[in-house]
Amino acid sequence: MIDVSAYLGHFAYRQLRHNTGAGLVQYMDRFGIQRAVVSSAAAITYRNPQAGNEEVAAEVAAHRSRLIPFAVLSPVYAGWQDDLKICHDQFGMKGVRLYPKWHNYTLTDPRCRAFVNAAADMGMVISIPVRVEDPRQQGWLIDVPDLNLDEVARLVRACPKARFIVANGSGIAGSALGRGGKDIPGNYAVDISRVSVEFGNELGQLISLLGEDRILFGTGMPFQYPGPALAKLDMLEASAAVKEKIRSQNAVRWLGLPADQ
């Protein structure tokens, strides 16, 4: 099983458990998760996100067989070109996570498109978390809303050569991303961390709308517990073959991992 939506490090507004490399691997073992894509939780609120990437690179060094590092960078922070090259060439990071609401830009900003195209040229995947934490849990100093899904769709259209993961989102089936159309390329996949199975069965809808090959397993740990994501797979009315694709096979292909992982 491969989790495409996990984190390491501290977060400015709440304590996170199991947030070290060793601690997260032990936590993954409890739930039968073999590998996880991780990025810096601290970099979400750092003025210079590269400091968080350096911390993650150090944490995953002893766990590269289990943890797949992604960078957190801001397209509007000076010097991102150098930081992106370091993350790719020196840290071996497979992708980048973008947090426009936290880093004060929009996905439609031309600088964001330039960043995405540069990362795509390096073969890196672009992950866009729609939410970091429930707004009801946010501290009194901040008010960060969920990312607008139509804004994500506009970036997907503008960068057809990039590979995207839309993470920790809900309502996707009813958005432009779910409805699709001739003008939206099939260059994005969706993780299951916040989509429903029982109420409205958004997961089933997404399988029908996007296809079973574009649904990925994700938990959001340690911001969220892994249990609900596992329960969704158990409850999903789909064949064992489809569930196995969601558990790991789709992530292997989407992330460009060796076929035996």
Model features per residue range: what roles?
Residues 91-95, 108-216:
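Catalytic pocket-lining loop regions of alpha/beta-barrel enzymes
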Residues 5-11, 129, 168:
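Histidine-centered divalent metal-coordination motifs
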Residues 1-8, 17-35, 85, 209-216, ...:
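Mid-to-C-terminal alpha-helical segments outside catalytic/metal-binding sites
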Residues 1-4, 37-40, 70-72, 97, ...:
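Active-site neighborhood of phospho(di)ester-bond hydrolases with catalytic His/Asp-centered motifs
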Residues 12-19, 43-50, 74-80, 103-110, ...:
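Acidic-and-aromatic substrate-binding clefts and catalytic sites of carbohydrate-active enzymes
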Residues 34-35, 47-135, 261:
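Active-site gating/metal-coordination segments in enzymes
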Residues 19-26, 51-58, 80-83, 149-152, ...:
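Alpha-helical scaffolding within the catalytic cores
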Residues 5, 28, 56, 60, ...:
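Conserved, mostly hydrophobic/aromatic
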